[in-house]
Amino acid sequence: MKKINYEFRERLNKELGGFSYNYCYQCGACVGDCPAHRFLPEFNPRNIILKALYGFEEELIGEGSMIWNCTNCYNCYERCPQDVNPIEVIVALKNMARRDETAPSGVDYVIDKVKSKGVTVAETELIKRRRKELNLPEFKMDCMEDLNKIFSINKDN
């Protein structure tokens, strides 16, 4: 039988700036409209909140954690009758995993792409050609100055 990891819960509370997830009464409203759950039934925001309540650190931010399957759609935020905001808990867990260096390597790759190019996926010749065929304007990246300001404020990321 696993024991509640109070130390991990305290870390999560600090990351969240509170403990709103303690108000979850496991109604499942967050799961009902979750696109990630629809395509991957193992992903379950309700279970993530339950594991957070128990402080199951390894299952939440260890290798193979399900939190990375969240699409950040905010449907759970809209549906929760208790204002638990499961997405905020999931984002906090992702931040903790990055700091603990347990995030999948692809996460750092995407962050590096955003820092260097301002996008998560580089524009390929195929994309350029398709945009032209669809009469879409050339893709211009003119936000790097703003992005660099944002990244300079938060040096942890």
PLM-predicted stretches and their roles:
Residues 34-35, 48, 157:
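Well-ordered, non-transmembrane segments within structured domains
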Residues 9-10, 14-19, 33, 55, ...:
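Sparse, context-dependent recognition of short Cys/His-centered cofactor- or disulfide-binding micro-motifs
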Residues 6-22, 148-156:
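N-terminal capping/interface segment
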Residues 20-37, 64-84:
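Cysteine-centered iron-sulfur cluster-binding motifs in ferredoxin-type domains/subunits
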